[in-house]
Every structure is written in structure tokens, then in C-alpha cells.
Amino acid sequence: MGIVFNYIDPVAFNLGPLSVRWYGIIIAVGILLGYFVAQRALVKAGLHKDTLVDIIFYSALFGFIAARIYFVIFQWPYYAENPSEIIKIWHGGIAIHGGLIGGFIAGVIVCKVKNLNPFQIGDIVAPSIILAQGIGRWGNFMNHEAHGGSVSRAFLEQLHLPNFIIENMYINGQYYHPTFLYESIWDVAGFIILVNIRKHLKLGETFFLYLTWYSIGRFFIEGLRTDSLMLTSNIRVAQLVSILLILISISLIVYRRIKYNPPLYSKVGALPWPTKKVK
């Protein structure tokens, strides 16, 4: 039972001394697919087809940097003793919430510079972000990381998972919860929901609902993981951040609904906030 017949090597191929890992390839595929999905929404919104290029570039760049900084902050006792490890990203260690924060800030700045409405852009890219996240979780699978607690092989078989997933959940002599798969399915479901209801939502609400949906799933799935960043011995950082994002997002939606009094559900489509003109 303990033999892995289809073990996946995290390294896809080597270019001389450089090892190209499946993790990086899958993340890149997720970003590219998300970009093409967002492009379709962009054209429907009447914006120039190149509008997202700078936004995605800077959001991805600063999101990656912020994801590393976020991870280092919550693992500071280790990095304080091993400062040379801070820049060794190839040893692992990024956090999606840090990436979201960095990407969000960069995206808003680019929107302001280009005189774009950040709420409209947020609505356009929200489904793409959660789709990319769902795809990116398979990079964790390839790295044999971000898994949950130990389970039996019988438990995994009861989930009717493909053998290659079951066999690669056998890590260091033990089977584990495939939390990467749980989150991937949750994210893809969120993508499907968002692309089907966003035309009935008001400006900004698609993005806020993305944050809410993702955070609900992350809160529960995080409770199964064994590699969580911890604020204290009992408080997981990702769960705390998820709760905050849920409260903030729902509060903003409710606040706008009360202040501007639009119908809860409209067949007309998204209407802009009373803000600067969308270009």
C-alpha cells in the first residue's frame, strides 16, 4: 500500500543548472488563462484590449513580492536567524493572502495612473483571479505541499479520486488530505458562479463577492492543513484574514445597497457607483 507507482517529480525539466518546476509552469498557465478570460470581459465592457497588460504585469510582480514578504513576516523567528534564506524563494515560502494584498495595491495604483475605474477593473478580473488560484493549487500538488492532516488510503479511495492523486498524497510514509484539490474545486466553482451572475450585480460587487467566496472556502480548508502560518498557537493567520475579508466585503456590499438603494437583484446589469466616469 505504501508504494507510489506514479510519483510526480516536482521538477519538470532542467536547463543546465536551472531546474524548471511544475509549480512555476502551472502558476504561469493559470495567469495566462485568467488573462484571456478577462480579455473577453474587457472587450464586452468597451475597453481597449491592452488595458489589462500593465495591470496584470505589475499586480503579478508586486503580488509575488508581497506574498514572499508576508510569509517571511509570519516566519520571522526562523528568518531572523537565517537572513540569507529570505531571498531564496526557490526553497519555498509564499502566501496567497500576501499576494492578494500586493496585487490589489499595485492594481489600484495602475488604475489611478491610467485614469481607470478600479471597481470596474476589479469586477472584470475577479473571476480570472479565482480561476488562476484554482489552477495554481495544482502546483502545490506537484510540490507535494500544502496538504492536510493524515488520513487512510481507504478514506481517499472513498472520495473516488484518480489513482495518481491518491498515490501522490502518500508523502513520507503517510497519506494526507488533498486540500489542494478541495480548494481547487471550490475556486473553480466560484469562477463559474461569478461569470454567470456578475451581469446582474452592481459595480464593485463581483470583486467583493469573489473575496467573500474565496475566504469562506479558505477558512474551512485552512483548518485541515498542517503547514499554516500561525499568529498564536491556536490562531491561524489565513483564517483570521479570511474572516476580516468576509466582514469587510459583505459590509461594503450592504452599505452600498442601503446608501444607493438599488434592487437586490437586477436584470439590467451592473450600474456604476457615483464616482468618476469610467473610461
Curated annotation (Swiss-Prot):
| Bilayer topology annotation | Multi-pass membrane protein
Molecular function GO labels: phosphatidylglycerol-prolipoprotein diacylglyceryl transferase activity
Give compartment(s): Cell membrane
| Similarity comment: family membership | Belongs to the Lgt family.
Q: What is this enzyme's class at the first EC digit?
A: transferase
Source species, domain of life: Bacteria
What Pfam families does the annotation carry? Answer: LGT
Using the UniProt record, give the first listed, main subcellular location. Answer: membrane
The membrane spanning regions, by residue number, are 18-38, 55-75, 89-109, 203-223, 235-255
- Documented EC number(s): 2.5.1.145
Query: Would you tell me the protein name for this molecule?
Result: Phosphatidylglycerol--prolipoprotein diacylglyceryl transferase
Q: Record's InterPro entries?
A: Lgt
